[in-house]
From Swiss-Prot:
HAMAP family: TolB. Part of the Tol-Pal system, which plays a role in outer membrane invagination during cell division and is important for maintaining outer membrane integrity. TolB occupies a key intermediary position in the Tol-Pal system because it communicates directly with both membrane-embedded components, Pal in the outer membrane and TolA in the inner membrane. Belongs to the TolB family. SUPFAM superfamilies: TolB, N-terminal domain (SSF52964), Tricorn protease N-terminal domain (SSF69304). The Tol-Pal system is composed of five core proteins: the inner membrane proteins TolA, TolQ and TolR, the periplasmic protein TolB and the outer membrane protein Pal. They form a network linking the inner and outer membranes and the peptidoglycan layer. It is found in: Periplasm. It comes from the Bacteria. GO terms for biological process: cell division; protein import. This is Tol-Pal system protein TolB. Keywords: Cell cycle, Cell division, Periplasm, Signal.
Amino acid sequence: MKQAFRVALGFLVLWASVLHAEVRIEITQGVDSARPIGVVPFKWMGPGTPPEEIGAIVGADLRNSGKFNPIDAARMPQQPSTAAEVTPAAWTALGIDAVVVGQVQPSADGSYVVSYQLVDTSGSAGSILAQNQYKVTKQWLRYSAHTVSDEVFEKLTGIKGAFRTRIAYVVKTNGGKFPHELRVSDYDGYNQFVVHRSPEPLMSPAWSPDGSKIAYVTFESGKSALVIQTLANGAIRQVASFPRHNGAPAFSPDGTKLAFALSKSGSLNLYVMDLASGQISQVTDGRSNNTEPSWFPDSQNLAYTSDQGGRPQVYKVNINGGVPQRITWEGSQNQNADVSPDGKFLVLVSSNGGAQHIAKQDLETGAVQVLTDTLLDETPSIAPNGTMVIYSSTQGLGSVLQLVSTDGRFKARLPATDGQVKFPAWSPYL
């Protein structure tokens, strides 16, 4: 746990201006059918009021996963703070088979000890399924709550939790000298900060696999350029600034390469840069437009969008050569694919009959499932555990971020109050 906090500390961007969070998750569908669970308000062991409501954060995380439906505190049959105080029968009467209890204890040195227990109320009634405690400073209390959520989620589902991840996105604010901002926040919209401000558009942020850098497109020089920015110190490395278009960056999962699209020779084509040497190799060629690369887990193959068949469709190609293989066949056009972390499926923007929605395609069976019913959906990005997708859609006259589970049952939005939000990118595990 101490190592996890040391790693997270490396992502504090001291040079960036911290903002009041402008996005918050608002659930729109699916929580009622999720598994009920009890997340009891954590007992505050100090004077006055607690600096953070840890239990509320854990409950929100589990609800936001789409897999759990924490009951309201008013419906709880009791509010224990330790496993020994839990009365299993009182919870099973409500259909609840697991309860999270915990405490927050202030320390003399100004830090806090957060402890929790996950209690089984049915199978082995009263037994402790998971427990832990963390000593943290005030600024890391939310992080400790997300850590509780990750551990509880993994214990109950067998899937690694992704509550300590972040999202990057571009905001076009309503005026000012620098109306275009690249921002990063916790996955739930809290702890938002500005990575870069620009008078010209910013596009297509992409995380490095260790979460320390973000590649993106900038037009500050009067034309498009690809850059990589280090979050810890703000250092910017220019990667590509060729004539015409430079866009769609994507780090390879092994962190050694960056794929992107260039139109320096006419049509858009895919290129890959070796990040250590700076050497660039061309992957696709021809007169068609090839763009929007997304890596497969082997760091050797790319899914990408091409109009070589007339309309945009998704193809797969090996970066070392070979004949591209078409992946998508349903719908009038498909684009903007993101390959899942395990390489078993992809999510993409699928257009059919004038509608433009996020869809999921199983790469083994080819089965396609439309996940969304929002308007003009764009740029899907999958969470590192493969359970959720964040994307942008049109709402009114602007654009907002939306969430959907990869089974399509859970939906939520992250409305912004100070501008249009586009190009979301979910971070790796941090």
